[in-house]
UniProtKB/Swiss-Prot annotation:
It comes from the Bacteria. This is Acylphosphatase. The active site is at R18, N36. Residues 3-90 form the Acylphosphatase-like domain. The gene is acyP. It catalyses: an acyl phosphate + H2O = a carboxylate + phosphate + H(+). It is an enzyme of class 3 (hydrolase).
Length: 90
């Protein structure tokens, strides 16, 4: 299982981005979290197989129709915490 951190920048708050991210991650079968950041970005921690992460990364590059994704930063997550079902944090 891979663990990846993503930070998505653009018009990604107030447009349903967290909900659609949760929906896509759940469809793919990922575990993890999604939450808004104070700087206007969205933080995502995703855990899954390489093919699941690849599919999710492709979706994040454009997001839902209501959003405008300018860029996505990706890093490996080195923490030891395991996540349950994908959830939205407030």
């Amino acid at each position: 299982m891979l663990k990846k951190q993503f930070v998505v920048y653009g018009i990604v708050q107030g447009v349903g981005f967290r909900y659609f991210t949760w929906k896509k991650a759940t469809e793919i079968g990922l575990n993890g979290i999604v939450k808004n950041q104070r700087d206007g970005s969205v933080y995502i921690l995703a855990e899954g197989s390489a093919s699941q992460i690849d599919s999710f990364r492709d979706w994040l590059s454009h997001g839902p129709p209501s959003a405008r994704v300018d860029r996505v930063e990706e890093n490996d997550y080195s923490g030891t915490h395991s996540f349950g079902l994908f959830s939205v944090e407030h």
